[in-house]
């Protein structure tokens, strides 16, 4: 298995698909990385040379924020919103949808299951 950005990417998949296993890299970004490194999109990770893997690794390190650094940045952004007390921060703190979705009938997963008392069985 090739190791890129601290993640073991699967060797039997195409390069574009394998790069999406890294947090912060989707399909469009994976295509851009392959174009930037001059690597064919359809080649499998098994068939990559060590030089090509090093090129991909360096390209990602120099141009993008991925994995732990990205997770830390996202959590710091959410912490900043909660600290300044803005509306989005309050919604994050309360565990409700942040971007204006309705909550009267939907948002069950974000709100969590309510603790309703279960009716006792009649004897």
Curated annotation (Swiss-Prot):
Signal peptide, first to last residue: none
InterPro entries: Rbsml_uS13_C, Ribosomal_uS13, Ribosomal_uS13-like_H2TH, Ribosomal_uS13_bac-type, Ribosomal_uS13_CS
UniProt GO MF annotations: rRNA binding; structural constituent of ribosome; tRNA binding
PROSITE patterns: RIBOSOMAL_S13_1, RIBOSOMAL_S13_2
Keywords in alphabetical order: Ribonucleoprotein, Ribosomal protein, RNA-binding, rRNA-binding, tRNA-binding
Gene Ontology CC terms: cytosol; small ribosomal subunit
Keyword Zinc recorded: no
Region (Disordered): 97-123
Any GO BP annotation: translation
Record's keyword annotation contains Cell wall biogenesis/degradation: no
Pfam families: Ribosomal_S13 (PF00416)
Membership in a protein family: Belongs to the universal ribosomal protein uS13 family.
Function comment: Located at the top of the head of the 30S subunit, it contacts several helices of the 16S rRNA. In the 70S ribosome it contacts the 23S rRNA (bridge B1a) and protein L5 of the 50S subunit (bridge B1b), connecting the 2 subunits; these bridges are implicated in subunit movement. Contacts the tRNAs in the A and P-sites.
Record note on quaternary structure: Part of the 30S ribosomal subunit. Forms a loose heterodimer with protein S19. Forms two bridges to the 50S subunit in the 70S ribosome.
Protein name: Small ribosomal subunit protein uS13
Organism for this UniProt entry: Ehrlichia canis (strain Jake)
